């Protein structure tokens, strides 16, 4: 019995250390009325090695409106993901002052926080960033990379109601948009955003979640993590100059039907019959499979 209790205690201590003790904060002063001092919560990935020659990527996580970031930076799900991929997590604690508009003040604050973090961890990559957000945070997770596309690699936005104006400047920044289909107003806005990008010949990965209102279904988080991990690994050259740049597929190989959640070969008869507004194109089977699996989750 004592052995069992000791084991349970060790597991609790290890879990607490893994997700709570690895976090810290950076404070940045701004001129924004309600944000004279902004706290940026960050998390160091497990087994961080300061002597490593290749660099560590950054994931910027924007929580819901006016979040303190304290819960997000200690997320077990995202903590596990960051440890697995060797990624630093940074979560802002913006409040009002139109913080989702990076060109006004919040973008500069984020870049200053990254610079400070880099002083402590010199092998952090301040380039080719990853972004994730939901609700008001989803606005940030697409507006921020649109503000600095040259410093961005990929973004995922869930339940978003405000998007950047589609631009060819974003053609090398990969995007994932998800939304509950019961979140009707945002769903319509999402469809319009994706269609505007399609007119520019730029593919945005898309998934709706049936019967979900303005919430965060686990399937959307799973898909976001699979999506960001895919591009994080595909573009390992961002972090190590000795790794060759990947050959990018110019033609999608699968097409998904957002209504029935199934995928088909792009040139198959069924694939060709999918309505334009329900079509989701995939350039890799890995992402196509993750898209299908996400629909089976609560």
What are these regions (language model features)?
Residues 54-58, 84-90, 125-130, 148-154, ...:
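Loop/turn elements at helix/coil->beta-strand transitions in domains of secreted/extracellular proteins
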